[in-house]
């Protein structure tokens, strides 16, 4: 199945219905630790409420991939978000992106990212994110390099290390 056979990429309107939250949460947990683990559905719903944009891919009516984007000025407590906020006044921050395992390697993440990049450009914003370097996420590092992201900083935490990336 290729992208043209999937429902097109759409932006969800908040508040999300329970089914949407549950489907996105399930994909998030399947992709942990590459994306942050959030076991509590309540905490995950709170994260969704803090996000500025949520783009999803669907296969028929089921969500199979997503990206959560934050803007500046959020009350989000993430150390990575705080670092980005300390460096940039206006931005789109990719908090997480994940694709359901049996839909990977089909260009969905690239399509979602292209939409985020185009929307950021349209708004005059940089698109920012972080990728784990400990544990090392080589697939994500290669992907972001291919998409034209450049390094803007690094940070070491107790459990992991990250590189911060920017796409202008």
Roles of regions detected by a PLM:
Residues 99, 105-118, 146:
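Conserved acetyl-CoA-binding loop-helix of GNAT-fold acetyltransferases
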Residues 133-153:
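Conserved active-site alpha-helix within GNAT-family acetyltransferase domains
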Residues 46-56, 65, 70-72, 93:
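A short helix-loop-beta-strand connector motif used in the catalytic cores of GNAT acetyltransferases and
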Residues 34-60:
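Active-site rim helix/loop that mediates acceptor-substrate recognition in acyltransferases
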Residues 68-96:
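Conserved acyl-donor/pantetheine-binding loop and adjacent beta-alpha core of acyl/acetyltransferases
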Residues 120-133:
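Conserved GNAT acetyl-CoA-binding A-motif
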Residues 85, 95-104, 133-134:
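A short, internal acetyl-CoA/4′-phosphopantetheine-binding micro-motif in the GNAT/acyltransferase core
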């Amino acid at each position: 199945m290729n992208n043209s056979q999937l429902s097109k990429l759409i932006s969800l309107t908040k508040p999300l219905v329970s089914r949407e939250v549950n489907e996105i949460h399930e994909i998030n947990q399947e992709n942990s630790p590459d994306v942050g683990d959030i076991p509590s559905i309540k905490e995950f719903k709170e994260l969704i409420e803090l996000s500025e944009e949520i783009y999803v891919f669907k296969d028929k009516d089921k969500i199979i991939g997503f990206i959560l984007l934050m803007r500046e000025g959020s009350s989000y407590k993430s150390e990575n978000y705080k670092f980005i906020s300390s460096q940039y006044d206006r931005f789109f921050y990719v908090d997480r992106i994940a694709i359901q395992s049996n839909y990977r390697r089909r260009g969905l993440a690239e399509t979602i990212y292209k939409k985020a990049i185009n929307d950021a450009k349209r708004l005059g914003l940089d698109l920012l994110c972080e990728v784990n370097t400990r544990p090392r996420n080589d697939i994500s590092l290669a992907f972001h390099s291919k998409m034209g992201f450049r390094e803007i900083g690094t940070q070491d935490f107790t459990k992991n290390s990250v590189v911060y990336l920017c796409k202008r």
